[in-house]
Amino acid sequence: MSVTYDDSVGVEVSSDSFWEVGNYKRTVKRIDDGHRLCGDLMNCLHERARIEKAYAQQLTEWARRWRQLVEKGPQYGTVEKAWIAVMSEAERVSELHLEVKASLMNEDFEKIKNWQKEAFHKQMMGGFKETKEAEDGFRKAQKPWAKKLKEVEAAKKAHHTACKEEKLAISREANSKADPSLNPEQLKKLQDKIEKCKQDVLKTKDKYEKSLKELDQTTPQYMENMEQVFEQCQQFEEKRLRFFREVLLEVQKHLDLSNVASYKTIYRELEQSIKAADAVEDLRWFRANHGPGMAMNWPQFEEWSADLNRTLSRREKKKAVDGVTLTGINQTGDQSGQNKPGSNLSVPSNPAQSTQLQSSYNPFEDEDDTGSSISEKEDIKAKNVSSYEKTQTYPTDWSDDESNNPFSSTDANGDSNPFDEDTTSGTEVRVRALYDYEGQEHDELSFKAGDELTKIEDEDEQGWCKGRLDSGQVGLYPANYVEAIQ
């Protein structure tokens, strides 16, 4: 009940009570909230599925990029395999996260969607059938009691008004006795007023008590009817709560990769791959394929022969090919076939270079003939090899010429500048960049569309020009990325 009327206590119950008229609406609203919570849970799982998909894509892209970098990079042997195993782990884990995404959307999401559709039925006029049924049930259960309560409130108000009038009449009579100007007739009227007020108080009190008694008589039935409708709402909510618990347990199983057998296998195999890395074996392989363990075609005495096609000198053999191919000599061993892609380097050449190669690789000619060989390094740049391949220098022949010595102090320290020589050929031309270009190697220029620079060498057969930025930096750039300034 909303108010308990007791002459001795007069305790007022909180107006927030469920039994107050209209306070059942919170229970009715819970039904609408259940429908909204189904939508919220679906949105929650949908966002998580998107995160799983994005993470899987990022893992795949990361693994692809780093696999290429490692395979083309300087790492070799069993440590290279261990490193690549980390990328394999990412690719396999990516597949598992895509499976998680599929499970969340195809199973959990759809399950909630179907349950929501079955549990809540929309009406033509708006709202849900379940909400209206609960609203009507509570209203019907509360209507008789609310009517009696209204009568009690009216009787209460009338009784309190009568009591107030009685108190006011008594106060006026007391004041009139102290006033000598009032005649007996006026005093008699005040006394009659008091008597009438007392009768009204008794009458309204009797009606008030009678109304309360009737209200008390209807209260048990009211409580029973309200409890019955409330329990129906509780049963409906219990189904939703149990369903949510069931779905969340399914979500937990789909998200928990630690219980997936293939997930454990991934990291067990990754650990085995890393532990299989053997530094001693890698060093032995490098010694056999790139170190003192390599075979050598030591110079031997060669008889002169009139058949030049069969007795070409080593110098003349190099002139007969269009390019110079440097290939590591395979040794007998377990890992003789594990040469990196950077082990073989193809260098295009031209007739002018052939002459210089001839002179620079002859160990018996004067050193004065090798002065121009350094500048030819730039003319044999191959743009389609990795940065690691470009930085490797393997001489095709022995020479005491420092320009062809891969172990000279300049090359060993990595400080040689291919543009230190005066490489300017032809007339310098001012050009303007048509597009943005970001240099991919240390000897390439970077610029933005609209930037101006100076072309100092014409386009080569690879489609590259040499230019100089206004900052003084000299390097290569694609010829079709610029136009001459008129």
Curated annotation (Swiss-Prot):
Q: Which family does it belong to?
A: Belongs to the PACSIN family.
A single GO molecular-function term is: cytoskeletal protein binding
Q: Could you identify this protein by its name?
A: Protein kinase C and casein kinase substrate in neurons protein 2
**Annotated ranges, domain F-BAR:** 11-282
Chain positions of motif NPF3: 417-419
The alphabetized UniProt keywords are: Acetylation, Cell junction, Cell membrane, Cell projection, Coiled coil, Cytoplasm, Cytoplasmic vesicle, Cytoskeleton, Endocytosis, Endosome, Lipid-binding, Membrane, Phosphoprotein, SH3 domain
Tissue specificity is: Widely expressed (at protein level).
Q: Which residues carry this modification: Phosphoserine?
A: 273, 313, 373, 399, 446
Query: Motif range for NPF2?
Result: 405-407
The record describes its quaternary structure and partners as: Homodimer. May form heterooligomers with other PACSINs. Interacts (via NPF motifs) with EHD1 (via EH domain). Interacts (via NPF motifs) with EHD2 (via EH domain); this interaction probably stabilizes the caveolae. Interacts with EHD3. Interacts (via the SH3 domain) with MICALL1. Interacts with RAC1. Interacts (via SH3 domain) with DNM1, SYN1, SYNJ1 and WASL. Interacts (via F-BAR domain) with CAV1; this interaction induces membrane tubulation. Interacts with TRPV4. Forms a complex with EHD4 and MICALL1; the complex controls CDH5 trafficking and coordinates angiogenesis.
Q: What topology does it adopt in the membrane?
A: Peripheral membrane protein
Motif window: NPF1: 362-364
What the entry lists under SMART domains is as follows: FCH (SM00055), SH3 (SM00326)
Q: Tell me the classification of the organism that encodes this protein.
A: Eukaryota, Metazoa, Chordata, Craniata, Vertebrata
Q: Where is this region: Disordered?
A: 315-426
Q: What happens when the gene is disrupted?
A: Mutants are viable, fertile and appear healthy withouth major defects or bleedings. Mutants show a loss of morphologically defined caveolae.
Protein encoded by which gene:
Pacsin2
Q: Where is the SH3 domain?
A: 426-486
Q: Name one GO biological process term.
A: protein localization to endosome
InterPro entries tied to this protein:
AH/BAR_dom_sf, F_BAR, FCH_dom, PACSIN1/PACSIN2_SH3, PACSIN2_F-BAR, SH3-like_dom_sf, SH3_domain
Coiled coil stretches, renumbered: 25-274
In terms of CDD domains, this protein maps to:
F-BAR_PACSIN2, SH3_PACSIN1-2
Localization annotation: Cytoplasm; Cytoplasm, Cytoskeleton; Cytoplasmic vesicle membrane; Cell projection, Ruffle membrane
Tell me which residues bear N6-acetyllysine.
53
Q: Name the species this protein comes from.
A: Mus musculus (Mouse)
One GO cellular component assignment for this chain's record is: centriolar satellite
Its main subcellular localisation, reduced to a broad class, is cytoplasm
